[in-house]
Swiss-Prot record:
Signal peptide: none annotated. The keyword Membrane applies. InterPro entries: EF-4 (IPR006297), EFG_III/V (IPR035647), EFG_V-like (IPR000640), LepA_C_sf (IPR038363), LepA_CTD (IPR013842), LepA_IV (IPR035654), P-loop_NTPase (IPR027417), Small_GTP-bd (IPR005225). This is Translation factor GUF1 homolog, mitochondrial. One of its GO terms (cellular component) is kinetoplast. Gene3D superfamilies: 3.30.70.240, Elongation factor 4, C-terminal domain, Elongation Factor G (Translational Gtpase), domain 3, P-loop containing nucleotide triphosphate hydrolases, Translation factors. It holds the Pfam family EFG_C. Its main location: mitochondrion. Residues 1-29 form a transit peptide. Keywords: GTP-binding, Hydrolase, Membrane, Mitochondrion, Mitochondrion inner membrane, Nucleotide-binding, Protein biosynthesis, Transit peptide. It comes from Trypanosoma brucei brucei (strain 927/4 GUTat10.1).
């Protein structure tokens, strides 16, 4: 009875027993009753709750006192969709898409809802978004046809969401038609920046929680982000079809209240797999998501009707014009748009003013959210920070592909196409604005608050397969950075690998996804060096008040070169794991990954929370992979902002045939230098091709050799033709051979050729 009363939109319902006529609550019967089935309609929303046991299909409802007991039977709870009624509170709009798009400007802000879907990894965001799109008629076909919002090839191959995707939906509710912009976001911690950008276009978030897994690390991260931005939060429990008993649901509800302070009465229960609870969720979005606000009006003289200059009507309309203000959320080119691209050679539709767009390689499509004013084709748009001016060639919404419309007004999220642009002008977070008349100036325009600058967590060198292709690689990286602005780029030179780029990422998975997108979208095969973290140092002359400076293998300075101390990034890592794996993970974290345990807490009967202070380098080196593999994917790992602490660091240089290989240099703690150097030279020894002379391999810390191996030379049997005689004849041949090899070695100092396969194997050894 206690749990039933607290379920959102289910009500306080009792069933009449068919045997004795008493009243009883069917939900609280997980311990014994073998109810054939029960169904009860929510008096407020029309949802029907269904419970079935053991596959029985009877229709009689009896109280627990008239049913046999069975401790081995567990109830399965689902929320079924409402039966169709004439007075349904809302229904999907049946008009054609063209009519709705043509009338898009007639939607007042009060009839617009912008909502983002956020959750931990694998809590059902993409699947639920796909079901909502199909329920509102945007997509056709079964849900099993594939997740629509995962457009990129790498997303479909890996089964994870990498890019946020937006889609506009139309639905009727209470006699009014609403425009709903749904934003599906990634769940992995490496793409947190993508989430923070996407929610800027929303007034609320759907905070999804897998009812079986409960509150996870990223759930709390998204919750605090929504609070910081002042967004409304609608908690949604997913995968209700997997619930075996009410204890699981009750525990998840209690955890939600304790962790977030959200009331369990606010929770919406859904099952995307069974398409249940979808109508209740849509109703909650309409009723509980705030509508956007902003100044309404035309924003450019091109939007005015053809009136004589100076006429009374024109003067009156110009007086009512308001400057456009919009924020740039994302941008992409033809190659990296995931299919969201309209060839600019085609003529825009009548809705966009029949603007002829010329084919141009510098065409950019931007996703924008309109704060004030109106955005149409031919609008002269100014970029606030770059101070450049461009003309909008086409505007529209994503429904589910790029659909041109007459305009984008206050509260709408849509796209705008620009041609002949400088791609570096369109930075994410840029404010787009207009000055419709002379009374408006740039000083009077308040820029939309941009996004916080993100700092890379790991760095890696990207080198093309062939050195002469570095220009193509740089072009591909710049195009992809428009769609993934969290990546930083610096030029890089290596004696062994040639010219390349040093890229900064938010995590190892982020790096892997970027590499795969370079191959799938641009055909760029690259050699990637092992990821390294950003170290820092403090100058001795500057004192403790001077901020530390970045340090890498390329900018390394020793203590005698004016360095006061080195600093290493540390994080607080939080692991939520099934209890059976907690002991193994805890032991490995402290033994092999320099983790210092801060907390160990039992969350419930099945899960344990572990918290460590750990160097970021050790987490990158393999702790995340170890946790996932050891727990078979059931554990989650989250870490907070970086904190730099003093550390005893050294640079390990690898010398092959007296030549330093900069691509294999690595920074590590002093006590780990011998083992790191030994792994690298051992890998080189096993992969290098033998030659006619010995190849010495050394690992150096400064001038001190901490590890050494030798690739032995092939030896020709120079005494093969000497079958008799004194031993001195053979010794003379051996001495001549030794002197000849010494002369060859002097001529080939630093001349050993290292194939990329050899370097890749050695680089992999640095990450072990």
């Amino acid at each position: 009875m206690r749990l039933w009363n607290r379920f959102s939109r289910l009500g306080n319902l009792l069933c009449a027993c068919a045997a004795c006529g008493c009243s009883f609550t069917p939900w609280r019967c997980s311990s014994s009753p073998l109810l054939s089935s029960f169904s009860a309609y929510n008096m407020s929303s029309g949802n029907r709750v269904t419970s079935s046991v053991g596959g029985s299909s009877g229709a009689t409802e009896v109280c627990p006192s008239h049913t046999p007991l069975s401790s081995s039977t567990l109830l399965r709870y689902t929320i079924a969709p409402s039966e169709p009624t004439m007075g349904s509170p809302w229904q999907t709009s049946e008009e054609s898409a063209s009519r709705r798009l043509a009338a898009l400007t007639s939607y007042p802000p009060s009839n617009i809802r912008n909502v983002a879907v956020v959750a931990h990894v694998d809590h059902g965001k993409t699947t639920l978004s796909d079901v909502l799109l199909r329920r509102t008629g945007v997509l056709k076909g079964s849900v099993n046809a594939g997740a629509y919002t995962d457009r990129l090839l790498v997303e479909r191959e890996r089964g994870i969401t990498v890019k946020s995707q937006t889609c506009s939906m139309f639905l009727k509710y209470g006699g009014s038609e609403f425009l709903l912009n749904l934003i599906d976001t990634p769940g992995h911690v490496d793409f947190q920046y993508e989430v923070s950008r996407s929610v800027r276009a929303a007034q609320a978030v759907l905070l999804l929680v897998d009812v079986a897994q409960g509150i996870e690390a990223q759930t709390m991260s998204h919750f605090h982000m929504a609070l910081d931005q002042g967004l409304a939060i609608i908690p949604v429990f997913t995968k209700m079809d997997c619930v075996l008993n009410d204890t699981t649901v009750d525990a998840a509800l209690q955890q939600l209240e304790d962790s977030t302070g959200l009331l369990r009465s606010e929770v919406v229960f859904t099952s995307a797999k069974e398409q249940l609870g979808v109508e209740a969720l849509l109703q909650a979005i309409i009723e509980r998501v705030p509508s956007p606000s902003g100044a309404i009006g035309l924003s450019d003289v091109c939007q005015l009707p053809p009136l004589l200059p100076g006429s009374t009507a024109r003067v009156a309309m110009e007086a009512e014009m308001v400057p456009l203000r919009a924020i740039l959320l994302d941008s992409w080119t033809r190659e990296c748009g995931g299919g969201l691209y309209r060839p600019p050679s085609k003529t825009s539709s009548a809705l966009s003013g029949n603007v002829k767009i010329d084919e141009d390689k510098d065409t950019v499509t931007c996703l924008v959210s309109v704060i004030d004013g109106t955005l149409t084709a031919r609008t002269n748009i100014l970029l606030y920070h770059s101070q450049k001016r461009y003309e909008a060639r086409e505007v529209g919404v994503i429904h589910p592909e790029l659909r041109p419309t007459g305009a984008l007004t206050v509260g709408m999220v849509g796209y705008v196409v620009f041609t002949r642009v400088q791609r570096e002008d369109f930075s994410v977070g840029e404010t787009l604005y207009t000055l419709p008349t002379r009374k408006f100036t740039r000083g009077g325009i308040a820029p939309v608050p941009g996004f916080r600058r993100v700092h890379p967590v790991v760095f890696a060198g990207f080198y093309p397969d062939e050195g002469e292709y570095v220009t193509q690689l740089r072009e591909a990286v710049e195009k992809l950075r428009m769609n993934d602005p969290a990546v930083t780029v610096e030029p890089l030179e290596c004696q062994a690998l040639g010219s390349g780029l040093q890229l900064g990422f938010l995590g190892v998975l982020h790096m892997q996804i970027f590499q795969e997108r370079l191959l799938s979208e641009f055909g760029q095969r690259v050699l990637v060096t092992p990821p390294v973290v950003q170290y820092k140092y403090r100058e001795a002359a500057g004192g403790d008040d001077q901020p530390p400076k970045p340090l890498s293998v390329h900018t390394w300075r020793w203590l005698h070169e004016g360095v006061s101390c080195y600093m290493e990034p540390h994080v607080t890592a939080t692991v939520v794991t099934p209890s059976e794996y907690a002991q193994i993970i805890d032991g490995e974290a402290q033994r092999h990954y320099r983790g210092k345990q801060l907390d160990m807490r039992v969350m419930d009967d099945a899960r344990v929370l572990l918290r460590y202070k750990m160097p970021l380098a050790d987490m990158v080196r393999g702790f995340f992979t170890f946790v996932k593999s050891q727990s078979h994917g059931y554990a989650s790992l989250e870490y907070d902002e970086l904190v730099y602490e003093e550390a005893d660091l050294v640079r390990v240089d690898i010398v092959v045939q007296k030549a330093r290989i900069s691509a294999l240099a690595v920074i590590c703690p002093r006590h780990e230098a011998p083992s790191v150097g030994k792994r690298i030279v051992a890998s080189l020894k096993s992969n290098l091709t033998r030659t006619a002379v010995d190849i010495p391999l050394q690992a150096l810390v400064g001038s001190k050799v901490v590890a050494r191996e030798t690739v032995r030379a092939y030896r020709k049997d120079v005494t093969a033709k000497i079958h008799a005689g004194d031993i001195s004849r053979k010794q003379k041949k051996w001495n001549d051979q030794k002197k000849g090899k010494e002369r060859m070695a002097r001529r080939t100092v630093g001349g050993v050729t290292l194939d990329q396969s050899v370097l890749a194997a050695a680089m992999g050894a640095t990450a072990l």
